Amino acid sequence: MSEHDRVVFDLKGYIVKPAVLSKNEIEIIKEFTLRQKNNPESLPPHERYLPGGPFAQLIAHREVMNVLLNVIDPDPEKIRLENVFLSHRQQGEGEWKPHAGGRTTNPNYAYNFHDGRIYAGMVRVVWELNEVLENKGGTCFIPGSHKANYNIRTNPVKSIDARNSGLWESYGCPAGSLIIFSEAVRHSADFWQNSQSPRIAIFCAYNHINVRHHKPDFKPAVIEQLAPKHQRFFRDVYHPQFD
């Protein structure tokens, strides 16, 4: 992780890495993911659901791991992947539902800086498989809210949460880009405003081996068929101190 990205992530709570995937990689993953969504019965059981199929190659993508090792834990054995889902939205579809933000003792939403490094809690990794126009439906953030002293997570302020408050920012990026953010930063989905193409984004939640936020729902048939280097991301939660 570059010093630039490290500082921006700490300052804003998120970073954007444009055009990480090649055009060929984008098309393969997008076509297969839409097939999972629209015609899963045409696939073998272990490829019908994420993270099965070609997407599995992105689980430990170097650009993802370069960040996670700097913001979750420097030991890759202590990083888990606990949730993966597809966000598919046509023109006008979406919602505005701000959440998170402010300091907390909940380890999934806590953001800390200690002894010269970031501990970001749960981290979302978003693969944008179509172009995103700025302020036209990408995920929105209140930058810096992951370190806010006022607890807007449990005590939200309507004038702050309003989309037109002037406090929210989003991003524009080409297809194949990567968005990485701390779950601690206040964020929201938005309404998709691109009539030329839908939003096709894959959201991943990475966490520390010590904690879990999501109820486990991965299909065993999918995980069992992953390569060993990817299966290790789906171990149960435990404290590895005495390994």
Annotated model-derived regions:
Residues 1-4, 243:
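Basic/polar N-terminal segments that are highly enriched at the extreme N-terminus
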Residues 67, 178, 185-243:
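Non-heme Fe(II)/2-oxoglutarate
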Residues 18, 182-183:
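Short His-Asn-centered micro-motif
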Residues 3-12, 21-175, 192-197, 204-218:
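Non-heme Fe(II) oxygenase catalytic core, chiefly the N-lobe of the double-stranded beta-helix
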Residues 16, 42-43, 141, 226, ...:
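Selective for proline/serine-rich intrinsically disordered segments
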